[in-house]
Amino acid sequence: MSYYDTIFSDHIDKIKSEGRYREFKALKRQADNFPFAMCDDKQIVMWCINDYLGMSKHPKVVQASIDAVLKYGVGSGGTRNIGGNNVAILELEQELASLHNKEASLVFTSGFVANDTTLATLAKIMPNIVFFSDELNHASIIAGITGSKAEKHIYRHLDVKHLEELLQSVDINRPKIIVFESAYSMDGFFSPVKDIINLAKKYNALTFIDEVHTVGLYGKTGAGIAELLDCSDEIDIIQGTLAKAYGTIGGYITANHSLIDAIRLSASGFIFTTSLPPVISTAATHSIRHLKESNQERKTHQQVVSKLKSSFDRFNIPYLKNESHIVPIIIGDPIKASKASNMLLNEYSIYVQHINFPTVPRGTERLRIIPTPAHTDEMINDLSIALVQIFAALNIELSSTKELNDEIYLNLIA
């Protein structure tokens, strides 16, 4: 083994010893039988998929994709500046701006890139900028802020009092931006959006909200928590994804014309990469349009979420209680979390990927359950029974959600 191979092997061995080694499952999703998939020639029920509403297989979206690929081909052919600025992506950007009631939008190849490159570029455009970021913001937000090398202040999770203290420490005339998520993907808690908006106004700051886990799911037309709270007009930059509730791929930001144009002209992560293919842009546009008009998917989704949480309450399964659709089951041990995930798959044909550090803090390792409108009462009952039996086999204690919430909160702020 070479010197360099030894370095890589030692790194992998360390991760394995901590129970954090990740193995990817070879899945074959069944578009005509959602949320089922095939894994090792066995049919399984998927409980951890981010295709929240099953829009990836919706007839309107699928047909639009077929029509687009026959008309435009598979790829986009280049960057937005050189050959890749197709009509389909322009139509998608118009649809996104309309969805969020903003003047303009800009589409990126992923939600990660949208956050990373936008935040870094804002710092390039405003060299004296100060970032204020929630301590549990997504890795893409952290990457953008850290990579910008701008001054940053990290406020305690969802703590607007601490945020205000930090804002007070910076000259009110200095450019600043508060960056936060509407819903946090690992615990499902909502941000105090209106309180943050009020602080931004008071201290002359821009607001940047990540609506990745809420667009399509909340609000009258699916525009997210800002729409639900009727405050979209008070937020400067809304970021979202096309890869979750809308069932496709890509990320975006929406804002006023001047901000979007400045990012378009300056963001390396936008300029120097091939654009989304027309087939994807077309599919996303049709998915957005459908969910703007139809509330049935959102209504059914919320009903399934409520049924799942009620079932977990009956079985005393220790999930982290929140008001969102994200249902984290806290295990608190990386080895047991991995074993629980494998037992669900191998013994019960249920797929729930375990989540360990560094995605979540040590001691809060978990199974994150993602309900969809397609999950049935029988599936909910099967999952609940399987979890109780696995908890018993692994000697994982059942506890009330109140006790769990208190315990996790202490871990998060430690």
Curated annotation (Swiss-Prot):
InterPro entries per the UniProt record, alphabetical: 4pyrrol_synth_NH2levulA_synth, Aminotrans_II_pyridoxalP_BS, Aminotransferase_I/II_large, AON_synthase_class-II, PyrdxlP-dep_Trfase, PyrdxlP-dep_Trfase_major, PyrdxlP-dep_Trfase_small
Cofactor: pyridoxal 5'-phosphate
Biochemical pathway: Porphyrin-containing compound metabolism; protoporphyrin-IX biosynthesis; 5-aminolevulinate from glycine: step 1/1
tRNA-binding in keyword set: no
Residues annotated to bind substrate: 22, 133, 152, 359
CDD domains: KBL_like
GO biological process, one term: protoporphyrinogen IX biosynthetic process
Catalytic EC class: transferase
Record keywords: Acyltransferase, Heme biosynthesis, Pyridoxal phosphate, Transferase
PROSITE patterns in the record: AA_TRANSFER_CLASS_2
N6-(pyridoxal phosphate)lysine PTM sites in chain numbering: 244
Family: Belongs to the class-II pyridoxal-phosphate-dependent aminotransferase family.
Record protein name field: 5-aminolevulinate synthase
Organism for this UniProt entry: Rickettsia bellii (strain RML369-C)
